[in-house]
């Protein structure tokens, strides 16, 4: 298997007790992060996972039996990337050397040192993924009692460790369930697909030259620059007034805002004395968070949403194409047939039942936020949503449930469910009638929000028939716009 450039590894057991030894009331399996929500739910892709409001009932209907469940998950909370970490160190250094005084609320910056490191999963991120595994088990208990998920992960350390933590959470829930009929042992097997340049990897696709390096590669940054110019000026002026001599730019202001979520998810302390000043319930938010108002955090959230939409999602002509390979793998799993794809799939892996088995009831894959944006685009999750305004903020309720914080926060998860219903639900025919008894139905949830998939005529419960769902994936089945990647 090593000759295929892939490893099937045994997951090392990280004692769940050590992860759960501290009280963590802010972050629970069912609801995710619920402290300081007026701020913490508006950090874009740096938000810790939280259960997103759903207009449709997200529970499994009483008249339906789930027969298949797939989760595609982002890794848990991490430290900044190496490039961003270096930029934050430079920013703090410039403040220390330039500022001649520190205004009210800014005094902590006088002695602040950047100590977050780079790239690695944080303790909060580990716990998020343990909680995610617990939640997956509980939701799909009827299947999970009988079968553990088949696990794949992109090869970066934080993603692999997230997959490990997920399996530990799943396993702890299984052991606590007296009704379970399987007794697997940790570590679980998993397929680790390397993220080396040029590798076919649907969980981290970087093969599309025009998207990675060509004219499509700057669309997201350009859109963010446009929106940033509409709101950041007054904030930067206020920050500079409190840090005279620092001479910060709008980009520096955004970097200071970035440090709020990164500092918060890096902390595992519980200090009730400072809880009310930040997140409450024993998990204070970083002092960086208090430098900005709630309305400014909403603008920050939208800035990140614009970047993801135009950088990797439906707003980029090649964004959804990056998710086509995974969607074609999903279709193969749903239908129980071999993968048919001409994009980013690895034919060697997907053609081997050891590394891509069909007929399993549970699957769990682990990836990155940008790759998940491509998958959501390829699924048509936000079809019908107008192009995001680059000059005025829009709320997610106006955008079909889209915001970076609602779609791809740390530990984000997409659930794809297949179920048989007894005839009491809708039929995937645009709401025009009821399905045949025991017809197979498919539904997609993004962080607990039921997505109304327009392409397959989702019913009043968000369900489409399996046949209509597969038919509606014509974009993916036709390889998207892959031909433009190398034009």
UniProtKB/Swiss-Prot annotation:
**What practical purpose does this protein serve?**
Phytic acid is the major storage form of phosphorus in plant seeds and, thus, in seed-based animal feed. Phytases are therefore of considerable economic interest.
State a single Gene Ontology molecular function.
3-phytase activity
Q: Active site annotated at which positions?
A: 75
Listed as disulfide-bonded, the cysteine pairs are 26-35, 64-421, 208-485, 260-289, 456-464
Q: Name one Pfam family in it.
A: His_Phos_2
Q: Which residues are glycosylated?
A: 165, 200, 247, 346
Tell me about pH and activity.
Optimum pH is 5.5-6.0. Active from 3.5 to 8.5 with phytic acid as substrate. The optimum pH is shifted to more acidic values with 4-nitrophenyl phosphate as substrate.
Q: Which top EC class applies here?
A: hydrolase
Enzyme Commission no = 3.1.3.-, 3.1.3.8
Q: List keywords of the entry alphabetically.
A: Disulfide bond, Glycoprotein, Hydrolase, Secreted, Signal
**Record has Secreted as a keyword:** yes
Family to which the UniProt record says this protein belongs: Belongs to the histidine acid phosphatase family.
Assembly mode: Monomer.
Question: What's the protein name?
Answer: Phytase A
Originating organism = Thermothelomyces thermophilus
- Source taxonomy: Eukaryota, Fungi, Dikarya, Ascomycota, Pezizomycotina
């Amino acid at each position: 298997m090593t000759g295929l450039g892939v490893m099937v590894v045994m997951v090392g057991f990280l004692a769940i007790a050590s992860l759960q030894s501290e009280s963590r009331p802010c972050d629970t399996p069912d609801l995710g992060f619920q402290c300081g929500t007026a701020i913490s739910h508006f950090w874009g892709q740096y938000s810790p996972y939280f259960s997103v409001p759903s207009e449709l009932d997200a529970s499994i209907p009483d008249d339906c039996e789930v027969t298949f469940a797939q989760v595609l998950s982002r890794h848990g909370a991490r430290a900044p990337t190496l490039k961003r970490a270096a930029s934050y160190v430079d920013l703090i250094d410039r403040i220390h050397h330039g500022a001649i005084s520190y205004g009210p609320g800014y005094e902590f910056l006088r002695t602040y040192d950047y100590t977050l490191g780079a790239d690695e999963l944080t303790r909060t991120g580990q716990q998020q993924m343990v909680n995610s595994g617990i939640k997956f088990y509980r939701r799909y208990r009827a299947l999970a009692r009988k079968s553990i998920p088949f696990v794949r992960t992109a090869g970066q350390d934080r993603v692999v460790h997230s997959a490990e933590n997920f399996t530990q959470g799943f396993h702890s829930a299984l052991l606590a369930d007296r009704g379970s009929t399987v007794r697997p042992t940790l570590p679980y097997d998993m397929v680790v697909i390397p993220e080396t340049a040029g590798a076919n990897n649907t969980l981290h696709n970087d093969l599309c030259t025009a998207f990675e390096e060509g004219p499509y590669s700057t669309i997201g940054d350009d859109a963010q620059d446009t929106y940033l110019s509409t709101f950041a000026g007054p904030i930067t002026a206020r920050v500079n007034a409190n840090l005279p001599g620092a001479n910060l730019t709008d980009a520096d202001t955004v970097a200071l805002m970035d440090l709020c979520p990164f500092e918060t998810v890096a902390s595992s302390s519980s200090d009730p004395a400072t809880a009310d000043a930040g997140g409450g319930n024993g998990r204070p938010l970083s002092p960086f968070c208090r430098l900005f108002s709630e309305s400014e955090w909403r603008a920050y959230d939208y800035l990140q949403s614009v970047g993801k939409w135009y950088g990797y999602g439906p707003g980029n002509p090649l964004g959804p194409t990056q998710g086509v390979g995974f969607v074609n793998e999903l279709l193969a799993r749903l239908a129980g047939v071999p993968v048919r794809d001409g994009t980013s799939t690895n034919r060697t892996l997907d053609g081997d039942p050891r590394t891509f088995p069909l007929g399993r009831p549970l699957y769990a894959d682990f990836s990155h936020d940008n790759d998940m944006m491509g998958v959501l685009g390829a699924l048509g999750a936000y079809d019908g949503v107008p192009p995001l305004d680059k000059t005025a903020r829009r709320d997610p309720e106006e955008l079909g449930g889209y915001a970076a914080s609602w779609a791809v926060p740390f530990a984000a998860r997409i659930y794809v469910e297949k179920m048989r219903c007894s005839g009491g639900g809708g039929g995937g025919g645009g709401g025009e009638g009821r399905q045949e008894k025991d017809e197979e139905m498919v539904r997609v949830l993004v962080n607990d929000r039921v997505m109304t998939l327009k392409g397959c005529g989702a019913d009043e419960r968000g369900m489409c028939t399996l046949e209509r769902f597969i038919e509606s994936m014509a974009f993916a089945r036709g390889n998207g716009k892959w031909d433009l990647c190398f034009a």
